[in-house]
């Protein structure tokens, strides 16, 4: 009886987690995808591959949605349910280096997707790519150490400059443009930050060896501080600095002098690789999260400890890595993160748990995640890019189910105030591949995905029904895996128990009537 109740709770949790959104557009490549970026104001996506080619595509979201609905209606008429699952019903486009235009498919009157331009932008792989604040300019840096500025609608190069590095083994790893001021930042494999004017492409400042000589994994603006202050991630540390100031003076400060004022402030060693980061709400800058190599999001609060150390952590996917993260920009305390297991997770940082899962691929990781100009999620790996449909949330029923289920298992809503709070809040999704109770808890989802077939099904992304079916398989395996720690779980999980009232015996009843408590006063003693 207990097992059935537990299975029902697990199934309810999985149903809430499975996203209602499905892809409306997919790009596939015959060469490894190196970078992808969405235009901030138009339905345009730019993809760069390992050969140095860059593709700029414009899409019509409404036309793509009509194609999706039309194909879904056709598939619904099929009697064979297996055929329904194995069919792809969104738009698929193959982008190849030798193609010049995109040809219309049979029965397609107007193109839902248009190839604006394609060019070989660099000799060798593209290492970084970014739009300016209004999307009119596109900046790219290649393995050839050439930085180029181009018109994003035509692809025509407006300016280029060669930026040689001190070592031939050193390469640029990250390109970020300021959204408010005319400068851009380049990070390299030796932990250096190069600041350039984005009009003239002239070098303005260099901040050297920030993360003990390790590569720059991510750069983003320090929200709430000066527009010139940024945060960088590298190896096992987080650092923040002013892009206008050099850190040459830091070299003369002894390492054990903790009171000295430095140009670069570095966090404590996190003993885990810090891969990506983002502020939860880019408007206030109260909380930021960092994706880690061990499959967790670490939560940081600048106003609490000046980014000396993480405040708490949110387990996402055990034995995997969180490779990319971005704010939902919906003022809902949520972020989207992509993981090496091919899933995209929507995480409520305040509650400290995953609230939605999307399956990008079963054989490829999610290396990039972005939002288009209408806040559609775009996920990308080494071989494909998927643009996801917007789900109309006309009611909050799903959120209420999720929240009430969490409250039944937990006493606290504040997922980022302490480790204990985070673990308690995320108890409700412990049956899925979200490992939210503790770092040592079993992760049935990640383990089951490790045994998936090496050949992906014709269906490259999963619908909600198929995702549920796939997650349900985890329940059977997790039941067997959980037998050996059932006793430990029962003993460690807090439960609210009703206290049973004991019946009073005759002596207690008599003392109660006489207002005595078993202790008598002895006069004159």
From Swiss-Prot:
UniProt KW keywords: Nucleus, Repeat, WD repeat
Keyword Ion transport: no
Keyword Magnesium in annotation: no
Gene3D superfamilies linked to this entry: YVTN repeat-like/Quinoprotein amine dehydrogenase (2.130.10.10)
Signal peptide residue numbers: none
Extent of Basic residues compositional bias: 485-501
Region (Disordered): 396-525
Compartments it resides in: Nucleus, Nucleolus
Residue stretches of each WD repeat: 28-69, 121-160, 211-251, 270-310, 358-398
GO cellular component: nucleolus
Compositional bias annotation for Acidic residues: 410-424
Any coiled-coil regions, as ranges: none
Domain of life the protein comes from: Eukaryota
InterPro entries found in the cross-reference section: WD40/YVTN_repeat-like_dom_sf (IPR015943), WD40_repeat_dom_sf (IPR036322), WD40_rpt (IPR001680)
Basic and acidic residues biased stretches: 463-484, 513-525
Residue ranges, compositional bias (Low complexity): 425-435
PANTHER family: UTP15 U3 SMALL NUCLEOLAR RNA-ASSOCIATED PROTEIN 15 FAMILY MEMBER, WD REPEAT-CONTAINING PROTEIN JIP5
Similarity comment text for this entry: Belongs to the WD repeat WDR55 family.
Name under which the protein is recorded: WD repeat-containing protein JIP5
UniProt source species: Kluyveromyces lactis (strain ATCC 8585 / CBS 2359 / DSM 70799 / NBRC 1267 / NRRL Y-1140 / WM37) (Yeast)
Top-level taxonomy: Eukaryota, Fungi, Dikarya, Ascomycota, Saccharomycotina
């Amino acid at each position: 009886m207990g097992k059935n109740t537990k299975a029902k709770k697990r199934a309810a949790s999985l149903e809430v987690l499975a996203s209602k959104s499905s892809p409306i557009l997919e790009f596939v490549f015959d060469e490894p995808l190196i970078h992808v970026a969405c235009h901030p104001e138009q339905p345009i996506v730019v993809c760069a591959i390992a050969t140095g080619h860059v593709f700029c595509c414009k899409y019509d979201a409404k036309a793509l949605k009509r194609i999706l609905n039309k194909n879904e209606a056709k598939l619904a008429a099929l009697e064979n349910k297996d055929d329904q699952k194995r069919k792809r019903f969104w738009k698929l486009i193959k982008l190849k280096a030798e193609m010049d235009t995109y040809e219309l498919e049979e029965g397609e009157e107007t193109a839902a997707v248009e190839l604006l331009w394609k060019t070989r932008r660099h000799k060798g792989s593209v290492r970084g790519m970014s739009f300016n604040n209004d999307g009119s300019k596109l900046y790219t840096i290649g393995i050839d150490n050439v930085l180029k500025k181009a018109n994003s609608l035509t692809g025509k190069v407006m300016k280029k400059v060669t930026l040689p590095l001190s070592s031939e083994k050193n390469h640029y790893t990250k390109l970020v443009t300021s959204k408010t001021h005319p400068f851009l930042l380049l990070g390299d494999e030796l932990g250096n930050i190069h600041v350039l004017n984005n009009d003239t492409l002239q070098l303005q400042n260099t901040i050297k060896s920030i993360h003990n000589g390790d590569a720059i994994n991510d750069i983003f603006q320090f929200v709430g501080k000066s527009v010139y202050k940024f945060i960088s991630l590298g190896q096992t540390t987080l650092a923040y600095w002013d892009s206008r100031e050099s850190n040459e003076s830091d070299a003369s400060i002894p390492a054990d002098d903790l009171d000295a004022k430095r140009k670069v402030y570095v966090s404590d060693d996190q003993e885990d690789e810090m891969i990506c980061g983002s502020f939860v709400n880019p408007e206030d800058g109260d909380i930021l999260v960092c994706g880690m190599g061990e499959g967790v999001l670490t939560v940081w609060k600048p106003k609490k400890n000046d980014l000396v150390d993480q405040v708490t952590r949110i387990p996402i996917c055990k034995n995997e890595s969180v490779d990319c993260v971005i704010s939902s920009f919906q003022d809902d305390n949520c972020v989207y993160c992509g993981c090496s297991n091919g899933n995209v997770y929507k995480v409520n940082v305040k509650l400290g748990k995953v609230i939605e899962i999307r399956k990008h691929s079963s054989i490829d990781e999610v290396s990039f995640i972005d939002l288009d100009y209408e806040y559609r999620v775009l996920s990308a790996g080494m071989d494909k890019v998927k643009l996801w449909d917007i789900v109309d949330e006309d009611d909050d029923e799903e959120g209420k189910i999720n929240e009430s289920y969490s409250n039944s298992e937990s006493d606290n809503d504040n997922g980022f105030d302490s480790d204990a709070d985070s673990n308690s809040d995320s108890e409700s999704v412990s049956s899925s591949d979200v490992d939210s109770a503790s770092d040592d808890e079993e992760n049935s989802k990640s383990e089951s995905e490790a045994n998936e077939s090496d050949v992906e099904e014709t269906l490259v992304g999963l619908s909600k029904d198929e995702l549920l079916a796939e997650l349900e398989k985890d329940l059977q395996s997790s039941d067997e895996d959980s037998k050996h720690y059932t006793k430990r779980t029962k003993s460690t999980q807090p439960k609210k128990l009703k206290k049973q009232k004991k019946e009073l015996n005759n002596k207690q009843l008599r003392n109660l009537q006489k207002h005595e408590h078993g202790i008598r006063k002895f006069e004159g003693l």
